[in-house]
Amino acid sequence: MKGQVVRIIAGFYDVVDPKNRKLYPLLRGSGLLRLNETSPIVGDFVDFEEKGFIKKIYERKNQLIRPKVANIDQALVFISIREPNFSSLLLDKFLLVIEAKNIPVILLVTKIDLDSNFENLLLDYQKMNYNIFFINNKKNEIPVELKAELEKKLNFVIGQTGVGKTSFINNFLDKKFAIQEISQTLNRGKHTTRVVQIIEKENFRIIDSPGFSSFSYSEISKNEIRNAFKIFKKFSSDCKFRSCFHFQEKTDQCGIKRALKDGKIPENRYKNYLYFLGKYEKKNY
């Protein structure tokens, strides 16, 4: 049988059959997988026995190391305007990793009711053609257009603590109902966010993870950093040298610097890139 890993607890794997959405709890990895030091992660497609072991892990289309998730269709990046205050550096940290993995991104900007200047803070990202939705936490409404974007996809949720991820999941998936159903099936008590897991309702699936503190870009190589951002990939093809890091090179030799000079890349995005590059050089990831 083929299924997808939706949760891992203490070496046991919960697998869902994608055809009928039936849950198969408490599976273990086979001896062959353990011999090869291979372990499934949340999001993996696997072959399994109904009351036994996971026998095979299928090739992943993408993967994050921290948190360990695979086969993401798109990432929902939460960022708040206030409480906590908006930070382009933090937002670009998330985007650096996600775009390096070629994962499509939707930006969900929360707490817009706390600052009337919220749209100006995101102007650079609008100019870079990011898909952005503004969320008013007081209204507790989810745009119909956003629901359409999320349907029939595996959506990875990431964002700083306190930006409204939990409220969104509760509101969007009726989380209490979904988790109660799973808890009764597995007899595991109430849900906590100490584990990465896929929560679903009807045609919507969201990867719930412990929080942004475990989100790491240490897995990205120096070569990936220089062309990680989607907009950098677009203009780096105009660089004279394939090894260009868009830093010490002359403007006429660097496609990124020319795009920056022409206003096609926001100055703040370039400054954040230099910050990440400097962190890499200091090995302080």
Swiss-Prot record:
GO terms for biological process: ribosomal small subunit biogenesis. Its cofactor is Zn(2+). The keyword Ligase does not apply. It is found in: Cytoplasm. HAMAP family: GTPase_RsgA. Belongs to the TRAFAC class YlqF/YawG GTPase family. RsgA subfamily. This is Small ribosomal subunit biogenesis GTPase RsgA.
